[in-house]
């Protein structure tokens, strides 16, 4: 009788332990899903920035084209040569700066894509692990109920004696 009580207590403790693990895994899943959502939002933000930078690059390329035309005209007008050359240099620097910003944004976007993929794989793995734990928890619950039923039968048979 004492062993059965100990076994019951052991099963209860084990069941509680599994329930705690299940709750921990459920919380981790929520955190990962939230992190994934944040990463997706960051990707959207970076995509918008990327589009904005693309627009700026096109604008700057257009400005650069205009500047080059002015530079050709400035060869005919020596007095304006210094002004056009300086403007051309400034626009080229802006273009380089924009290209650097675009490259940085693209790198961040690639990194965010990788992080998003990694988080997705991690979520899938955690969901599979959660499913395994839920299955084990159900098995332990079933075993607990069987043990409880056996204990009740033993108690009834002892009372009948």
UniProtKB/Swiss-Prot annotation:
Keyword match tRNA processing: no
Region of interest (Disordered), residue spans: 32-97
Keywords: Coiled coil, Cytoplasm, Cytoskeleton, Phosphoprotein, Repeat
Record Pfam families: Tropomyosin
Comment block on domains: The molecule is in a coiled coil structure that is formed by 2 polypeptide chains. The sequence exhibits a prominent seven-residues periodicity.
More about this protein: Present with 11100 molecules/cell in log phase SD medium.
UniProt-recorded name of the protein: Tropomyosin-2
Organism, scientific name: Saccharomyces cerevisiae (strain ATCC 204508 / S288c) (Baker's yeast)
Gene name linked to the record: TPM2
């Amino acid at each position: 009788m004492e062993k059965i009580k100990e076994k019951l207590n052991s099963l209860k403790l084990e069941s509680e332990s599994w329930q705690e693990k299940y709750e921990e895994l459920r919380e981790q899943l929520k955190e990962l899903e939230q992190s994934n959502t944040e990463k997706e939002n960051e990707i959207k933000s970076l995509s918008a920035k990327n589009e904005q930078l693309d627009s700026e690059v096109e604008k700057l390329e257009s400005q650069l084209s205009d500047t080059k035309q002015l530079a050709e005209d400035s060869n005919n007008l020596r007095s304006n040569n210094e002004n056009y050359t300086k403007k051309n240099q400034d626009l080229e620097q802006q273009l380089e700066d924009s290209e650097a910003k675009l490259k940085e944004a693209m790198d961040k976007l690639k990194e965010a894509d990788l992080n998003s993929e990694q988080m997705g794989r991690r979520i899938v793995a955690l969901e599979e692990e959660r499913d395994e734990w839920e299955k084990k928890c159900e098995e332990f619950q079933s075993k607990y109920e069987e043990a409880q039923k056996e204990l009740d039968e033993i108690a009834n048979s002892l009372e009948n004696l």
